[in-house]
Swiss-Prot record:
InterPro entries: Homeodomain-like_sf, RD_transcriptional_regulator, Transposase_8. This is Transposase InsN for insertion sequence element IS911. The gene is insN. Pfam families: HTH_Tnp_1 (PF01527). Gene3D superfamilies: Homeodomain-like (1.10.10.60). GO terms for biological process: DNA transposition. Involved in the transposition of the insertion sequence IS911. It comes from Shigella dysenteriae.
Amino acid sequence: MICSPQNNTGAPMKKRNFSAEFKRESAQLVVDQNYTVADAAKAMDVGLSTMTRWVKQLRDERQGKTPKASPITPEQIEIRELRKKLQRIEMENEILKKATALLMSDSLNSSR
């Protein structure tokens, strides 16, 4: 039988969503303020494995590694947004190239 995680009262726990800012500030307790992972997790009321993951992600992002999860540092958030924008612009450029070629082809055929 598979059981879902439960809180102290025995009721099923709801998945909590945390903002990038909350994750970053929580991880900074360990990385910048020398808290232990356990102390930071307790102070921020999150699980130990969650805090460990956030600390690893913050360290990776500060080293310039692109995160697999949603980025938490402002720089990585901006990089992700810029990549999406670049991808959209490249797609629009391809569409314009094809449209131009089609229009040129039509104008050549109609002039004959």
